[in-house]
Amino acid sequence: MASNSTKSFLADAGYGEQELDANSALMELDKGLRSGKLGEQCEAVVRFPRLFQKYPFPILINSAFLKLADVFRVGNNFLRLCVLKVTQQSEKHLEKILNVDEFVKRVFSVIHSNDPVARAITLRMLGSLASIIPERKNAHHSIRQSLDSHDNVEVEAAVFAAANFSAQSKDFAVGICNKISEMIQGLATPVDLKLKLIPILQHMHHDALLASSARQLLQQLVTSYPSTKMVIVSLHTFTLLAASSLVDTPKQIQLLLQYLKNDPRKAVKRLAVQDLKLLASKTPHTWSKENIQALCECALHTPYDSLKLGMLSVLSTLSGTIAIKHYFSVVPGNVGSSPRSSDLVKLAQECCYHSNRGIAAHGVRVLTNITVSCQEKDLLSLEQDAVFGLESLLVLCSQDDSPGAQSTVKSALSCMVKLAKGRPHLSRSVVDTLLTQLHSSQDAARILMCHCLAAIAMQLPVLGDGMLGDLVELYKVIGRSATDKQQELLVSLATVIFVASQKALSAEVKAVIKQQLESVSSGWTVYRIARQASRMGNHDMARELYQSLLTQVASEHFYFWLNSLKEFSHAEQCLTGLQEDSFSSALSCIAESLKFYHKGIASLTAASTPLNPLSFQCEFVKLRIDLLQAFSQLICTCNSLKTSPPPAIATTIAMTLGNDLQRCGRISNQMKQSMEEFRSLASRYRDLYQASFDADSATLRNVELQQQSCLLIAHAIEALVLDPESASFQEYGSTGAAHADSEYERRMMSVYSRVLEEVESLNRKYAPVSYMHTACLCNAIIALLKVPLSFQRYFFQKLQSTSIKLALSPSPRSPAEPIAVQNNQQLALKVEGVVQHGSKPGLFRRVQSVCLNVSSTLQSKSGQDYKIPIDSMTNEMEQRVEPHNDYFSTQFLLNFAVLGTHSITVESSVRDANGIVWKTGPRTTMFVKSLEDPYSQQIRLQQQAQQPLQPQPLPQPQPRSAYTRF
């Protein structure tokens, strides 16, 4: 239990381990490089990639690569080969080499060796460095020269280097194109070398003229050399060139279709299908109706199942893109083909019941995509064909436990989810099929079916009640063994039951689940089911499961983690007893919930570690506590209208002060404070949202809903009590119409709509403030709290991990020591950074750019005390940089005209591909001491020395008056 649970909330937390600093680690490796033993030298060389991963900043990487270049220069060929492998593994760090000239100079010196193997390794080394030296003419010359070598190893290395430089340098590509053409067409060039030279032409895409000349050469090769190997290599290079240059892609599709149709060789047909699949995924918009029709005809007439499978794979890829709309579109002047009578539909219908399950899977995928994409009224037969095809495929493959069958089941189930979402009237038959098949399928297929049922029930909650009975009956009979598949099935089936139960679980369902878990389940399975219960809002079930796990963990931190989850579930369970119009019991329920929340936050704090501080979880729970306290305070404020109504002279006071709110008495000030508190909570929820770059979309939506709840109550207070005249309901009107992806979101949206309607109705009918207004506010709070809170995935699991590491230069010797700068000079602050990822980078969103904000403030002032312009005391600058290979760097010029100590704060935030800014941090601070420049100091000292010599002015006599003596 302890080892497995580490995956959930301690994943990817490996950036804080205490190890050697960068210089010490480099010195250790340098000691190995200087060893006289070849084994120790090789061991030191191969450990460099790990060093680059831990300390990815240019100063260390530059020093390390210079040492490796020395080893490459003076070592033997085996050491050179090791250095080459390290360079290729560390490709993303090459641009951090500062002394590129010196590095290349040491490597390039080996090119003049008499040993052809040494020259070959050097050429491969230069090819691996092409990204940082694309325009080095000496490297270009050496590659051209080595292509004419009589040593095969050197020529192959030159071909490798030529391919890499062609991809990076336009000048090299233009210069080498003719030479490659001559070598390919030359009679003296061996065939195997020609086959290696042809792929270089795929990089000739730097401009249209170069791409056109490469296409002409490839066209000649395809025609002149009809052997199978030459045709395959030339056609594939042709395709890659077309995909990269985006020139003549339709012509390439036609050429591939021509070879697919006319060439009798099976290998060529297979290559044509693979390349068509590549172009279908990269450029589906370039496919014409005629291209798809030709591919359908080939698939209908081919006798080979393997080729038919490949062609259907291309068609299934195209059917999910814009190409399918082009195929069925009606051109003006022509009669468009009906989807029911087209060759594509005919082919898909034929293949739906094919004995080859791969062909059948692609056939039903094509039918599903056509059914969902073509929104026509007369597609009833196609819909039925798609449903029947999916049913037969599911029956065929769900009994088979092989990986191929499970892949087919997964494909069929994804089509079912898509069909249920696009055509909701088919969802009932899809669900019935799945429930029927669940009883007789293999465990692996059952797990996938449960995921499919959960996805459909989330989209269409009305189907949940109908499937609940069958699911509970199935839950009673599974789990007879403790195998991994059975444990996974227990979790998946419990998840579907939670989704299908729109409200609280019945006692019978709870008893069935607990009985199964007590018999064969492991602690990890129980934890996963409890986690799903917390996510779906079944907090009473979750509390019991967490309670049962407390004695099964071996770590103190895990114990506190489970205990905190138990307390949070208990706290949310206390809120299920809320009743509308019962305000006193609502206060007691909230107080009871807060008691358990405070216990839980104490346990959660104890569960955190330096490597995993649980910052999101702690902040989310603190906000929930503050929100409950704000709700409680608002209910007390509303109740105070009964215990402390406005005085009789309240209207007179309001008219005297010119403040109409004073008519309501002291409740008006309390309401104003409550509104500000809810707006403050909404702002804090927004900050939590912006700090959660690695969270999944469901978690972010959950945080957003909490923020909207705060804004809703603040708006209701303003509209009902504080400012009913100017309250606007326009911006809140569309809240309920938004598409909801979960039952929790759907219920919250329903509450928002109902509360807004009641507030708007009261706002129009009655003047503030009456018991109806306060009752409306209290009922709004109760309605929000009656929806069980959902603890989403990011609360338990961190699937994506992204962090930024900053390095500032110049850097002080110690963090508290300031850097000295003269006040008449500017400080050039260089900010370097590395974006570090966990095991799944970019799973939810990627870093597009990094925003760096640099600000400075005057901490302590030295020198004369006179008024200083505010602009001279502070610096405020911002830059946006795009990381390249996860590295970025920029500079700021800062002015410190005022003498004294200044603090510089550098804060980073992240901008994703959608332009959203995320406040990920980190925040780094350093100190600068602004010193007076020597010339100004000398002049000031001279002026101070001259001041005592000047006569002091006599004081002016004060005029006497009657008040002087007093």
From Swiss-Prot:
Compartments reported by the entry: Nucleus; Chromosome; Cytoplasm
Signal peptide: none
InterPro entries: ARM-like, ARM-type_fold, INTS7, INTS7_C, INTS7_HB, INTS7_N
A GO biological process held by the record: DNA damage response
Disulfide bond positions: none
Keywords assigned: Chromosome, Cytoplasm, DNA damage, Nucleus, Phosphoprotein
Modified residues (Phosphoserine): 338, 809
GO CC terms: chromosome; cytoplasm; INTAC complex; integrator complex; nucleus
Coiled-coil region(s): none
Family affiliation: Belongs to the Integrator subunit 7 family.
Function of the protein: Component of the integrator complex, a multiprotein complex that terminates RNA polymerase II (Pol II) transcription in the promoter-proximal region of genes.
Protein name according to UniProt: Integrator complex subunit 7
